[in-house]
Amino acid sequence: MAKADKKPAEKKPAEKTPAAEPAAAAEKKPKAGKKLPKEPAGAGDKKKKRSKKNVETYKIYIFKVLKQVHPDIGISSKAMGIMNSFINDIFEKLAGESSKLARYNKKPTITSREIQTAVRLVLPGELAKHAVSEGTKAVTKFTSS
């Protein structure tokens, strides 16, 4: 009988406690619910504005060129990331080389001539020739418009 007495004793407080807790929790939740969304929402908006950085990528342009060359072929996000890194790397090398050339010639400005020479130095053979011709064409188009 001692075991039978213990079970109802355990069940009765368990039944009373959940009935009391939801009522207390229901009373507290709307108050907390009203206060909490306002503060984190305001803080969340500020954090989003602060943490949002303008990360410049070439993904749009890579995709446009891909569609010009092969309209039926797609590209995975990993491959796009690799292409973006590749372009950043090449541009960094070209900028560094053209900067060195300007310093060697004791000139404060990097002109299209320094860029063209840097392209010839950084890129190999045929690729350099094609890059120079495309660059010249782009500069001509830009200056004429």
Swiss-Prot record:
The modification N6-methyllysine is found at residue 3. InterPro entries: Histone-fold, Histone_H2A/H2B/H3, Histone_H2B, HISTONE_H2B_site. Residues 1-53 are annotated as: Disordered. The modification N6,N6-dimethyllysine is found at residue 12. GO terms for cellular component: nucleolus; nucleosome; nucleus; plastid. GO terms for molecular function: DNA binding; protein heterodimerization activity; structural constituent of chromatin. PANTHER family: HISTONE H2B (PTHR23428). Core component of nucleosome. Nucleosomes wrap and compact DNA into chromatin, limiting DNA accessibility to the cellular machineries which require DNA as a template. Histones thereby play a central role in transcription regulation, DNA repair, DNA replication and chromosomal stability. DNA accessibility is regulated via a complex set of post-translational modifications of histones, also called histone code, and nucleosome remodeling. This is Histone H2B.10.
